[in-house]
């Protein structure tokens, strides 16, 4: 396909229209008085959202050059979301401001490579200032503040804070859609995996349809058990102890399953069989996790262990086990703390080393089950449209909260970026590098200007006032007052603010140093050929 190429001033100018279009759609959502954006869906109801990464994903422009500009800014939002999970709107607004200011200076004859160096120095100083302003998150109320600001909902803030308190920072918190109207929190204590009982005859509580085992022994193996003779020796030892038994195996079937069920129905002893969780190597790792948690051994031929010669000492123990049709929950595992901590450290190292997002997610789940727990926020709403919008907000708030726990909190509402201006002004540069510093200085004001504009106020007046105020004093657009942002609970995660600024500057610098743009030449749609006159057939000629 033929290409068209644009050089020098034409190249960035044609992309600038796309750079402006995308932020214009996103920036209206910024701040407490930000608006929503409606996204068309080919199937189902439209999506109403104020999420700064969902909106850019939907934008594709017809003109190839404009679309390239829009996609560059989209990358800022996506990268910021990937690192910090929030701050996408701020990052988009910052990137557009830097590109706009930068192009003015490049058009006036400034050298883009020198401007870039100045921008990098300025952003470096601003990032260090953000880190120095950051305060660690020390209590539940601070976590609730971060989540409430991100979700624009105090109730959601409290739910996320409660979830984090219960499962710890290593715990997994997931967001699911509820069937009701109320948003609620469900916490699973202990280790839970998604495998249920092998036979419904094993249940002990017919009302709840679950098997509850108190203080049981746990046989853990990666083998398939079909012959009862294989496990008879260990079964006899368990029966003599008078305790119930949980068998976790690749599968329990045939004669072995029938014998367990018959003995349960006769009341001889209680044994529940469940399939091992996961598949392949992940299954082996999860069985080792269960063994560490319960203080047992995985009976596997790889270690030279045989089911027939298994002793009671090799079985795991737990305070309580609840088995439903779909899940098994191990509560109060009797494993040695040092072994569990060693296992946790090993999984943490694997999380750091892996390059696969899928593997990282699965490792994070295993870590949570060993070290923390699992909490589920079930989102309720009156309509499907509201449910989707609410779920997106809660996911953003959750990401922002995790980032806050990691690197601390800073004053919100764009205040920290204004506070960083003094540090940037102190950067020593020569020649045209000063232009790069000026571009960053001007863009640091942009989020506050936009928050004010969305509230129907004049941003310049507020920016000038904030520059004179002490660090931490900001503008609360919801009440239109100047307040101590930390005391008022208007906070952002330091990681979110830092990532937004760094990613915006990175893409802006790349944009400004672009000298040529290549795009596919649009195809001309040829008019469809008309039908020929069908002469010879009386009355059938075309009029």
Swiss-Prot record:
Keyword Lipid metabolism in annotation:
no
Extract one GO cellular component term from the record. cytoplasm
Q: Where in the cell is it found?
A: Cytoplasm
Against SUPFAM superfamilies, the record matches this protein to:
GroEL apical domain-like, GroEL equatorial domain-like, GroEL-intermediate domain like
Q: Name one GO biological process term.
A: protein refolding
Q: Which residues bind ATP?
A: 29-32, 86-90, 413, 476-478, 492
Q: What GO MF terms are annotated? A: ATP binding; ATP-dependent protein folding chaperone; isomerase activity; unfolded protein binding
Enzyme Commission numbers on file: 5.6.1.7
Catalytic reaction annotation: ATP + H2O + a folded polypeptide = ADP + phosphate + an unfolded polypeptide
* This protein's UniProt keywords: ATP-binding, Chaperone, Cytoplasm, Isomerase, Nucleotide-binding
- HAMAP family (UniProt xref): CH60
Q: Which family does it belong to?
A: Belongs to the chaperonin (HSP60) family.
Q: Provide the function of this protein.
A: Together with its co-chaperonin GroES, plays an essential role in assisting protein folding. The GroEL-GroES system forms a nano-cage that allows encapsulation of the non-native substrate proteins and provides a physical environment optimized to promote and accelerate protein folding.
* Subunit architecture: Forms a cylinder of 14 subunits composed of two heptameric rings stacked back-to-back. Interacts with the co-chaperonin GroES.
Question: What is the protein's given name?
Answer: Chaperonin GroEL
Question: What is the species of this protein?
Answer: Brevibacillus choshinensis
């Amino acid at each position: 396909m033929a290409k068209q190429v644009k050089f020098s001033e034409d190249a960035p100018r044609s992309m600038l229209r796309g750079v402006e279009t995308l932020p214009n759609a996103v920036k209206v959502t910024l701040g407490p008085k930000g608006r929503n954006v409606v996204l068309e869906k080919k199937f189902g109801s439209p999506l109403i959202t104020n999420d700064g990464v969902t909106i850019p994903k939907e934008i594709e422009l017809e003109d190839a050059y404009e679309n390239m500009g829009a996609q560059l800014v989209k990358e800022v939002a996506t990268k910021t979301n990937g690192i910090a999970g929030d701050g996408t709107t701020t990052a988009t607004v910052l990137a557009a401001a830097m590109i706009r200011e930068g192009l003015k200076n490049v058009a006036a004859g400034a050298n883009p490579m020198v401007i870039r160096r100045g921008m990098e120095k300025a952003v470096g100083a601003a990032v260090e200032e953000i880190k120095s302003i950051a305060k660690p998150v020390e209590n539940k109320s601070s976590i609730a503040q971060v989540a409430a600001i991100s979700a624009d909902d105090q109730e959601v803030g409290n739910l996320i804070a409660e979830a984090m308190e219960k499962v710890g920072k290593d715990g997994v918190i997931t967001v699911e859609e509820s069937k009701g109207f109320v948003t609620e929190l469900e916490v699973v204590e202990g280790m839970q995996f998604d495998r249920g009982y092998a036979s419904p005859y094993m249940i002990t509580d017919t009302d709840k349809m679950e098997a509850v085992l108190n203080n049981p022994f746990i046989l853990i193996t990666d083998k398939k058990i079909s012959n009862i003779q294989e496990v008879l020796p260990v079964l006899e030892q368990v029966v003599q102890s008078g305790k119930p038994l949980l068998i976790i195996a690749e599968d329990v079937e045939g004669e072995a399953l029938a014998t367990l069920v018959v003995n349960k129905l006769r009341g001889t002893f209680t044994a529940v069989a469940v399939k091992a969780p996961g598949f392949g190597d992940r299954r082996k790792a999860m069985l080792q996790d269960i063994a560490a948690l319960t203080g047992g051994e995985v009976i596997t031929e790889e270690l030279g262990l045989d089911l027939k010669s298994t002793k009671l000492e090799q079985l795991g123990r737990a305070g309580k086990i609840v088995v439903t049709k779909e899940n098994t929950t191990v509560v109060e595992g009797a494993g040695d703390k040092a072994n569990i901590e060693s296992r946790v450290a090993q999984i943490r190292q694997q999380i750091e080393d892996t390059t696969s997002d899928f593997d990282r997610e699965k490792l994070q789940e295993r870590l949570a089950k060993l070290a923390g727990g699992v909490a589920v926020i079930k989102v309720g709403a009156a309509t499907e449209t509201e449910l989707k919008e609410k779920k997106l907000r809660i996911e953003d708030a959750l990401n922002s909260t995790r980032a806050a726990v990691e690197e601390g909190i800073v004053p919100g509402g764009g205040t920290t970026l204004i506070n960083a201006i003094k540090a940037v002004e102190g950067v020593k540069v020569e020649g045209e590098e000063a232009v790069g510093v000026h571009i960053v200085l001007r863009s640091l004001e942009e989020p506050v200007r936009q928050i004010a504009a969305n509230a129907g106020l004049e941003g310049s007046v507020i920016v000038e006032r904030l520059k004179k105020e002490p660090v931490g004093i900001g503008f609360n657009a919801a009440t239109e007052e100047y307040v101590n942002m930390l005391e008022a609970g208007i906070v952002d995660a330091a990681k979110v603010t830092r990532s937004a600024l760094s990613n915006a500057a990175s893409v802006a610098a790349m944009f400004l140093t672009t000298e040529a743009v290549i795009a596919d030449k649009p195809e001309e749609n040829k008019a469809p050929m008309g039908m020929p006159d069908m002469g010879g057939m009386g009355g059938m000629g075309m009029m």
